[in-house]
Amino acid sequence: MTEPIISFKDFSFQYHSQATPTLQNINVDIYPGEKVLVVGASGSGKSTFANCINGLIPFKTKGNITGELYINNQDATVSCLHDRSNVVGTVLQDTDGQFIGLTAAEDMAFLLENNCVEQDDMKKNVSYWAEKVGMIEHLNHRPQDLSGGQKQRVSLGGILIHRTPILILDEPLANLDPATGHETLRLLNNIHEETKSTMIIVEHRLEESLDDTFDRVLLFKDGKIIANTTPSDLLKSSKLKEAGIREPLYCTALKYAEVDVESIDNLANLRDVCMSEHVKFKVKKWIDETSANNDNKYKSEPLLELNEVCVQYSDYSNSVLNNVQLNVYRREMLSIVGHNGAGKSTLAKAICGFLDITGNIQFCNRGFNQLSISERSEFVGYVMQNPNHMISEKMIYDEVALGLRARGMKESDIKIRVENVLKICGLYAFRNWPIAALSYGQKKRVTIASVLVLNPEIIILDEPTAGQDFYHYNEIMSFLIELNRQGKTIIMITHDMHLLSEYSSRTVVLSKGQVVADTTPVLILNDKKICEIASLRQTSLFEMAEYIGISEPQKLVQLFINHDRKVRRQ
């Protein structure tokens, strides 16, 4: 019988800074050549599990270990980090923590340089993998000139060059646009088939992840593995809901249409599911019997106006934003989407005053160009994509209170506002924790809280739900909806196609620094040409409509959104 390449036996791990173990009594074997998906809520122990395999725990991050862990038949606690890196390659969730080169090419070549590979061979290897991960045109770019998604692809290319027998990817889709994420999964599948490596993918985006095939899914909750099974069997169970993970949208739609999902053999394959005449009948019946009116209307009063706005990072580069014309209306929830590097984050930074622009920005008919960053922050709050770029304090409470203290507010008033926001963001229980002890997703919530507490009129959120489990996804979005009802204008930069459909009244699509579409989100996702230009990808609801033969997919999508809202209000 084949020996496992990874074996946990009664394994527990506790960080020195925490009172209880993050991993508790883990027993699991992973075999050579397997492809395993690891899912779980934010802070459930997924990344800690991965870091125990790659050696960051205990060789970099210290803590108390009980039980046994064997990697490639060797006791994992007695080897060194260098030796482990020859067996396990990891693409970290935090791309800035992995990017060490001055250019993309230099970063990808780091291992080859250390191994004294001839320069001609080095260039061939780097070019080959840069082409594979879609970064061939960006090899000479500096890390600060790359988007979060582009940095992640550079890291992926640098790891793939090494060809280790075990490959771990921690949230590989988190910073990628939907189409690129789909291509990444296909690339990883091809690599897995070619190399027969053992692949472990840690991911929140379950619907997108299941586009790929996995041998098993490990589901984490509170530091324990509560499911170790096939994707189809997991979707049939109630374990995802128990763990705070959103099931694929089509699974929820099937249940709303009163389809018995437990009777479906291959539930993880949407095309196979929709071949059933019974499924087709039930879904069409649900659509015919239910109204799908959409009462989302955005307001007609402009709050923020951008006229011919351009941004160019240097005299020798092309414009990142090119003559952008855009109105943001009072009290709307606007989503901005587009491919990696389209200019979405640059647009947000231009509005906030972080970048020099040409053109004109007005706020309530008042010139915005002349205002400083500090003055603009009275009107516009910005939550960056990468939480590490925002965090300044060591403790959670102090980080959220920082802006209020800078404005001279009384400490008693600060306490009330900070604690209220921490409760809404699911962080109150951690208010006295050091930020260093938080997961990436938890850090994201801290940065959202630090901006929400300042109460600006416009709130721009760059990937507000990235790295969040379904429970905190709903908590954050429900809070944003309530802010919107109170008169706040919300701008969301997102790769989550269902988020823009469900929560925004209007969607602006950027491609190569220009606005290429500006209409309702459902119409955007129903336009295959726009989706292709901007690297968007229709949700499984659109795919379900196509497979079943529904001529107007937007009806199914809007019906689902309306029905889902009613169910979650109950």
Curated annotation (Swiss-Prot):
Which Enzyme Commission number(s) are on file for it? Answer: 7.-.-.-
Locate the residues binding ATP 2. Answer: G338, H339, N340, G341, A342, G343, K344, S345
Q: Which GO terms describe its cellular component?
A: ATP-binding cassette (ABC) transporter complex
The record's SUPFAM superfamilies line, in alphabetical order, gives: P-loop containing nucleoside triphosphate hydrolases
Give any Pfam family that matches: DUF3744
Top-rank taxon, per record = Bacteria
Q: Which PROSITE patterns match?
A: ABC_TRANSPORTER_1, ABC_TRANSPORTER_2
Q: List the disulfide bonds.
A: none
Q: Which part of the chain is the ABC transporter domain? A: 6-247, 304-537
Cellular compartments annotated:
Cell membrane
Enzyme class of the recorded protein, top EC level:
translocase
Q: Where does ATP 1 bind?
A: G40, A41, S42, G43, S44, G45, K46, S47
Entry membrane topology: Peripheral membrane protein
Q: Which Gene3D superfamilies match?
A: P-loop containing nucleotide triphosphate hydrolases (3.40.50.300)
Alphabetical keyword list: ATP-binding, Cell membrane, Membrane, Nucleotide-binding, Repeat, Translocase, Transport
MF terms per GO, please? ATP binding; ATP hydrolysis activity; ATPase-coupled transmembrane transporter activity
Q: Which family is this protein grouped under?
A: Belongs to the ABC transporter superfamily.
What's the stated role of this polypeptide? Probably part of an ABC transporter complex. Responsible for energy coupling to the transport system.
Q: What's the protein here called? A: Putative ABC transporter ATP-binding protein SA2476
**Organism, scientific name:** Staphylococcus aureus (strain N315)
The uppermost taxa in this organism's lineage are: Bacteria, Bacillati, Bacillota, Bacilli, Bacillales
